[in-house]
Amino acid sequence: MLYKYLFIYIVTKISLSSSLYHNFCTINNTNGSNFNVFDTNNGRFLNKNNRIRNILNKNINKKSSFSFINGNSLKNFKNDHKYHDFTKFTKIPEFLEEDNEPIVSELIRNFCIIAHVDHGKSTLADRFLEFTKSVPPERLKEQYLDNMELERERGITIKLQSARIKYNSILDGKTYTLNLIDTPGHIDFNHEARRSISACEGAILVVDGTKGIEAQTVTTANIAIEKGLKIIPVVNKIDLEHCDFKSTAESLKKFFGFKESDILKASAKKGIGIEDILEAVVVSIPPPKVDLEKPFRALVFDSFYDPYRGAICYIRVCCVFRLYFQVFEGSTKIGDEITLMNADITSKVTGLGIMLPEMKQTHSLQLVNSSGQVGWITAGIKKTNEIHVGDTISLKSYVKKNLVEPINKFENSKPTVFAGIYPCIGGDFDKLQTALEKLKLNDHSFQFERSDSSMVGMGFKCGFNGLLHLDITVERLEREFDTQVIVTSPSVPYRCTLRDKSVVTVDDASKWPDESQIKSSEEPWTDVTLRVPEEYFLSFINIILSSVGSVMSMLSKMRGRFKEKNKVKDTNMVVMNYDLPLSEILSDFFNKLKSVTNGYGSYDYEGTFYEPIELCKLKILLNGTEAKGLAVVTPRNRAYDRGKLIVETLVNLIPSRQFKVPVQAVIGKRVISSSNIPAVKKNVIEKCSGGDPSRKKKLLENQARVLLVLINDVIGKETNGSGRMCNNPF
């Protein structure tokens, strides 16, 4: 009894307020029977002696949400203070009121929105939610589906988001269930768009009427067409005076073969044409092909980590995972034992539901009454690396009997940019590792492995899909996980053929083979599509010629290969194709493109192939000692320019010491660039105005001994203390 009342006192002092609904947690005895129920809204216990059934019926009408703490007696709560932290309770998703209503598969439409950055994709999603009254007007805000603070600050969509909306068609009067997936538009997050496309039967292609079709939009739309999705073209921003609907429509017809009657007009900002788009979704996009008689199968297309709900509901489990998935066949319910087929992991369903767009649980414990739905599921899985996007979920009994086959829907994304991420404080290595594991659960294109550096200690070598992906990842580490990190300069994977005929891929300069062992080397190239206004074409050609080489200088510099140029009919846009080294895209190529075209130019790149080039390892020496973390791999014919840039940057970056510090760029044993950090000298014999010269000699010898100690401290602190280095010019 003492334990019981002690626990009641603790939780009632920290009761949470909620004007919307009640939250309850059920405490179980060691024998598994319900001990009592605690109402986190009112801070009171409701046990069987307190007429729990009547109170539940009266207060929450059987619609409230429950969280379970299994197999723990009150003695456990008393002895472990972490169970007393009820300040971290979060609102558990409410049960869905319409859960018992049957949903016919023929009335389901799964679709995504494809658009370039700033073409009005998120605004259009807002209008869908507003028009269908899926979100109350007082709660609706701009970029409603963009949950990250970073997304709102930068005005871009980083993570795909799903929402289920109900729409009453004016054509047949039927109520349709529309599963909307809002997708990112930037090329660095193209993997998110690919996952969205794989979970849909149709897509809305949104094009800004003031800018026309962008290169990245063409790439993503072609992926959707290859997957067999029905495309609905929409020209947005028709309310603006400089919107050129005619030329944009002509471009859509040229690139994708649309009929003019298929192209819709809209203004997401003003709410024009929203109903026409929704009707087109209902009429044009086919329902999912399903069979309820077949065994349950679902495709995992996203997941994320929920630390607070894990602390409440799954005390014996390290964390809680929520998986977003699409049901292809059959159905499931809470309590079922499911298996992740590719990972071969079995767990019990502890929660499931849909997005409206907030998470809602299903009251009848039935996830869907028809296949083809998009929803979420929770299961007690102990390790973050056990969740894989593209995995197939099925019931354990079906998997054991080999009644189901995995759904092969995703291709693994290969990183194109590599950088090292290290904790600013050496003791934060475990914290950083945990943060990266949780981040990977929500960003499946992000890859990392452990790496040790003599300069910055233990850390991780990470792979990204581009520089923006790298920048966003570092921002998320700092904001979401409170982890301060050092980021080394981005690099690309090079390939070396050794004299023993073995081939190695090197994405870190510290792993570069000895020069005597290398027979030949190659660097990655990529196929780049550029779209620029015709009036900027000559200026753009000058950029290509000056920064990445022309066809005539290709043999000597191995930079830039022009392939073809096409004029888009009835527009002032020029589309060009180039082969460019991937390392050039990592530099300031994009900034130069935007600068010379006044922001109208765009580019996209896909695929990688290797071209032979003579590469070398450029080492940096500080006071005669190699700074391994500053070494880079570079084309030999550009080594001098890059070495000079690094040396000049370090001379300006490292503060002066009491002695001169030479900074050198070295290839093998040959110094190709050198400079000195001037000394800040202290005149130790200034106080000796005269007298015995041995006194001055002694002071100078003492100073020399101190300098020897300080000299050994040149490497590391000053170069490492600069923090995030991803924007360094070298």
From Swiss-Prot:
Protein name per Swiss-Prot or TrEMBL: Translation factor GUF1 homolog, mitochondrial
The keyword Membrane is annotated on this UniProt entry: yes
Localization terms from the record: Mitochondrion inner membrane
PANTHER family xref list: TRANSLATION FACTOR GUF1 HOMOLOG, CHLOROPLASTIC, TRANSLATION FACTOR GUF1-RELATED
Any one GO molecular function term: GTP binding
Role: Promotes mitochondrial protein synthesis. May act as a fidelity factor of the translation reaction, by catalyzing a one-codon backward translocation of tRNAs on improperly translocated ribosomes. Binds to mitochondrial ribosomes in a GTP-dependent manner.
GO cellular component: mitochondrial inner membrane; mitochondrial matrix
NCBIfam families, per the entry: lepA, small_GTP
Species of origin: Theileria annulata
Species lineage: Eukaryota, Sar, Alveolata, Apicomplexa, Aconoidasida
A Pfam family it matches: GTP_EFTU
Family: Belongs to the TRAFAC class translation factor GTPase superfamily. Classic translation factor GTPase family. LepA subfamily.
Endpoints of the signal sequence: none
EC numbers: 3.6.5.-
Additional comment: This protein may be expected to contain an N-terminal transit peptide but none has been predicted.
Keywords per UniProt: GTP-binding, Hydrolase, Membrane, Mitochondrion, Mitochondrion inner membrane, Nucleotide-binding, Protein biosynthesis
